[in-house]
Amino acid sequence: YLPPSQAMMGGEGWLNPAQVKLLGDAVLRQCDADDGLVDGIVANVEGCRAKFNVNELRCAVGQTGDCLTHAQVRAVQAHHAEYLFDFSLANGVRSYPGRPLGGEGTPGSGPVGGWVSWLTGQEAPAWPATPRNSIGWVYGSGAMAHFIARDPNIDIRQYEPGRYAQRVRE
């Protein structure tokens, strides 16, 4: 959760709840029927990954409203992209899969919520984290500061896993 959340820092790449719905609706419009059933579920996740293009939601010059800015498109891409570590974990793994497409607009909160609950929050990621930030940011930033860096005063916005490779491997 941390690298994509860092892409939303300062608010430039952050998607508000209406923009998350816009994204979720676009994913469903393009991918829901791929399994032959229009049911609000993206069952063919890999097929959707191959065909969904978030750039289609990018705002035209001067456009605002039902579109995403360049920074927001990059943040969405960061959420879906595989994260590559510049070192190997203890088990030899060097990457973490990106989030699958589907479920972006799932309503609700807590463990059953979609992106607003887990990834974007009601406000852009802040440091220190606030209750209106996403669950992923609250948990992730706390874990990085207290478990990995072991420094409650670290500016998590500047966190880079490579600096803590030994701790991450433990």
Show where each model-derived region lies.
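C-terminal His-loop and adjacent cap/lid subdomain of alpha/beta-hydrolase
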Residues: Y1-E170
